Structures are given as C-alpha cells and as structure tokens.
C-alpha cells in the first residue's frame, strides 16, 4: 500500500522540470499551424470588408459614401479595447518585483493566440453561414474576439507567477471555448443584455481563474513569499496599466452597443461610475491604515471596479446618479475585498489569488449582473417609451412578448450560468493542469522571471526591507522605508 502511495505521489508530484525548450515551441507551432488550416477552411471577409461584396452592398442599399462602412463606426472603439487588452491588462500585471516580463509577455502570448481561436469559436456560434459553411469576420468580430480573450486574461491574473506558459496556453484554449458556449447561452438562448460583459467576461473569467487556482493550490507557496510583492518602480508600471484601463473602459462597455442613444448612454454611465469608484477606493484605503496612508494595491485595482459593475446595466436608463451609486458601492466593496476577503480566501478556502481578481472582476462582475437584472425588471414605458423598451432589450421576434419582469429574471439567470460554467470548467481545466507534463515552477521558484526568461543582471539588488507586500496582505505597520539606508562601501 505504501509503495502504491509513493508511486502516485511520484506521478502527480515529481521534481519540477521547468525546461520548456520542446513543449513551448511545439505548442506554439502546432497550434498556430492549426489556426492557419482552420482559417483557410472557415474564415472569410464579411460584406463590409470584402471588396466585391461591399460594392454589391453599396449598390443594393444605395450607399453613396464609403464612410457608411461599419469600420468607421466601430474601429475607434476597437482601438481602445485592443489597447486595454494588451497594454492595460499587460501592465496591470507587472506589479510583481521579479515577474514583470512574465506579466506583460505571457499576457501578449495568450492574447495573440486567444484572439485567433476566439474568431473561430465565436464565428461558429454567431457568424456561420449555413449555406456555405463559412464564417464572416469584420471589425465587430475583432472586438468580440478581444472580449473573449479578456476572460482568459482575467483568469491569468489569479494564476500569475504560479504556472508555465504552456499551462497558460491550455487555460486560454479551454477558456475561449467555454466563453463562446456560455456567451451563446446567455446572450442568445436566455436573451440577456450584457454589452460590457459584467456576466460573460468578468464574472466568468474571474471565477474560472479562481477555480483553477483552487485546484492548483500550493501549500508551500510561502517559500516564494520573498518575490510575491512589489517594489516602487513595479507599482508605477502597474499604475500605467490601471490608467489605460480606466480611461478606455467607457469604450470597452460601449464598443458593441447599438448605434445611437444606447452607445452614448453606455459611455456616459461607465465614465461616471469609474469616477465615483476612485473616490471611495481612496477613502477606504486611507481609513484602513492607522496613519491614513494609501495602499497602491487598492488604487491600482479597486478604482476600476465601477467600470466592471456597469458592464451590464450601462446601456439601460439607470440615470447618472444611479451610475454614481454603482461606482460608489463597488469601490467600497472591492477595497474591502482586498483588505479582508482575499486573506480569508487564501487562509480558509485555499485559493491563492495573485492579482486579487475576485475583488476586481469576479465579485463586481457578479454584482453588475444582478444590478442589470434589477434595473431591467424596473424598466417602465414612462421612462423608456414602448419603442425604447423594444430597442433597449431587443424585444423582437420570438422575444416580442417578453415583459421587463421576465427579462430581469433571465438576466439574473445569466449570472448563474456564467458562474456555473466558470466553476465546472475551471475545475476540469485545473485537474488537467495538475498533470506533471507542463513545466510549471517549483514552490520556491514562483513569481520569478528567471525560470522562463533571459533576465539581465540588476545593477543593484533589492533590499528585503524595501519590499512591498503583495496583493493579499498589508505592509508591516512598523516598517517605514525612511528607517533604512544603504551603506556605501
């Protein structure tokens, strides 16, 4: 019996081999070749990007100017969303003192792979022509692909520094697949409205990553505690990511909203909610420290919670003061999450959430979904007009007889679907990632770029006393940087 246990332990917990010279190139080459083949078989330009079809469309619809092409309406929003995906998310994850290459570099890798797979997965569900078997893509498809990738990047935040790039490719492969299915169920079958993705992106991506992190729990992760934190310059780089996300979040939430008042209103509501969450985050962060000092962890993350929570309800008539209330509350809730919920989750639930995605994405996304359900159920003809209700909630076709109360119920059901897909899918993916074939780092080598990157030598070492704490704990109350000096030899 003891020999069997030793064999099992040896299979699932062998000595870590982080040499990915074969596995990473193999995965990248094979999967990219697969993308080329699948694109060749399925992907074609849509009517507004194919020259022949565009000329036919202009003639048929009496379009006199190329400015009517959807590209000119959607591309500014696409640019903003694309910057958020690769610069915003990438730099937000550079806060770790020795894992900035991995934060921004692996974000780049899985983003580039994920958007290709997303064009296929979402195309099969939303843009497949049954007569030709082809998928038509245009600028709106590019935006939706970026949205799809965002969920996997959010999941990466919970796993930051603890997994190999090969594992991240697997997380993205399954994450994009699960996203496409749950999005189709929520938006098409349940007919929920979720333009900014509180449910389908943030709630799903957050709990997907947290579940994987739970399955991959490392009881000896404290061996890398010296690296699980920030230094002054790494927090500054992370703040760059925060500012890009904060500035462009109105574009993120409104990018695929219908032209007209809905898109306009979505940008306004998101803009207002984001501003409100900044003030409440600063207030709670200062109040929680005995000398009133601000914690950069809170400022980098909780200030964005208003944008996450407004993702579903932003296109509804929530009113400007309603948007302020949403930002006000989520800024408080997110900051309290970093103060109390994350330490609780790590200690008692065995969930090691490196970036605190539960507080920035999962919890605000879930709240945003339920806020959307309440606002939808409370909609009236007096506020929207009958035509406005039809346009806002798309009460047409087989959904023409749906009431706002029923719509609110389905909106709430959409949140549950997102969480269910995240938890079940995350558990399965986590079990796959536990196989000893992925080249993941040992417990004492987590959060260290040197495992997977060629790292130049530092001119100066990092003094242990100047290390900032991580996104799970506070700084030691009795340590002040001014108490220490470096002696020159």
UniProtKB/Swiss-Prot annotation:
InterPro entries: Ammonium/urea_transptr (IPR029020), NH4_transpt_AmtB-like_dom (IPR024041), RhesusRHD (IPR002229). GO terms for molecular function: ammonium channel activity. The keyword tRNA processing does not apply. It holds the Pfam family Ammonium_transp. GO terms for cellular component: apical plasma membrane. It is found in: Apical cell membrane. Residues 1-21, 97-100, 162-169, 217-235, 288-298, 342-359, 434-489 are cytoplasmic. GO terms for biological process: ammonium homeostasis. Its main location: membrane. The chain crosses the membrane at residues 22-42, 76-96, 101-121, 141-161, 170-190, 196-216, 236-256, 267-287, 299-319, 321-341, 360-380, 413-433. It is a multi-pass membrane protein. Glycans are attached at residue 62. Residues 43-75, 122-140, 191-195, 257-266, 320, 381-412 are extracellular. Keywords: Ammonia transport, Cell membrane, Glycoprotein, Membrane, Transmembrane, Transmembrane helix, Transport. Belongs to the ammonium transporter (TC 2.A.49) family. Rh subfamily. Homotrimer. Functions as an ammonia transporter. May play a role in the elimination of ammonia in the gill. This is Ammonium transporter Rh type C. It comes from Gasterosteus aculeatus. The gene is rhcg.
């Amino acid at each position: 019996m003891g020999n069997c246990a030793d064999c099992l332990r040896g299979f699932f917990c062998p000595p870590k081999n982080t040499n990915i010279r074969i596995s990473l190139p193999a995965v990248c080459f094979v999967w990219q070749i697969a993308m080329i083949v699948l694109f060749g078989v399925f992907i074609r330009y849509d009517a507004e990007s194919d020259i022949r079809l565009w000329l036919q469309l202009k003639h048929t619809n009496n379009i006199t100017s190329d400015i009517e092409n959807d590209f000119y309406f959607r591309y500014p929003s696409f640019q903003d969303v694309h910057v958020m995906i690769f610069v915003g998310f990438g730099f937000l994850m550079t806060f770790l003192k020795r894992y900035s290459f991995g934060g921004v570099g692996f974000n780049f890798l899985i983003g580039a792979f994920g958007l290709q797979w997303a064009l296929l997965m979402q195309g099969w569900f939303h843009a497949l022509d049954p007569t030709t078997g082809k998928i038509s893509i245009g600028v709106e498809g590019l935006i939706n692909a970026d949205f799809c990738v965002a969920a996997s990047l959010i999941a990466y935040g919970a796993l930051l520094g603890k997994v190999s790039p090969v594992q991240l490719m697997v997380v993205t492969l399954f994450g994009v697949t699960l996203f496409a299915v749950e999005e189709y169920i929520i938006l098409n079958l349940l007919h929920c409205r979720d333009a900014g993705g509180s449910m389908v992106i943030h709630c799903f991506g957050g709990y997907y990553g947290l579940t994987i992190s739970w399955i991959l729990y490392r009881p000896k992760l404290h061996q890398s505690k010296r690296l699980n934190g920030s230094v002054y310059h790494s927090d500054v780089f992370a703040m760059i990511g925060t500012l890009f996300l904060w500035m462009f979040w109105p574009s993120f939430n409104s990018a695929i909203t219908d032209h007209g008042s809905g898109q306009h209103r979505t940008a306004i509501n998101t803009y207002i909610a984001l501003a409100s969450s900044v003030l409440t985050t600063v207030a709670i962060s200062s109040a929680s420290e005995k000398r009133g000092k601000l914690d950069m962890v809170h400022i980098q993350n909780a200030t964005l919670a208003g944008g996450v929570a407004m993702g579903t309800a932003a296109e509804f008539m929530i009113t400007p003061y309603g948007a302020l209330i949403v930002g006000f509350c989520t800024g408080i809730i997110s900051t309290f999450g970093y103060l109390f919920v994350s330490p609780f989750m790590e200690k008692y639930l065995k969930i090691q959430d490196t970036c605190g995605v539960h507080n920035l994405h999962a919890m605000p996304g879930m709240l945003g979904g339920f806020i959307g359900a309440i606002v939808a159920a409370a909609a009236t003809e007096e506020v929207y007009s009958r035509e406005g209700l039809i346009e806002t909630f798309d009460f047409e076709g087989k959904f023409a007889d749906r009431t706002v109360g029923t719509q609110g119920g389905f909106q709430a059901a959409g949140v549950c679907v997102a969480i269910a897909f995240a938890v079940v899918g995350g558990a399965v993916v986590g079990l796959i990632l536990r196989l000893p074939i992925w080249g993941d780092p040992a417990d004492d080598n987590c959060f260290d770029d040197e495992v997977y990157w060629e790292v130049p030598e530092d001119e100066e070492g990092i003094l242990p006393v100047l290390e900032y704490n991580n996104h799970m704990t506070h700084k030691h109350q009795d340590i002040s940087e001014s108490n220490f000096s470096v002696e020159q030899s």
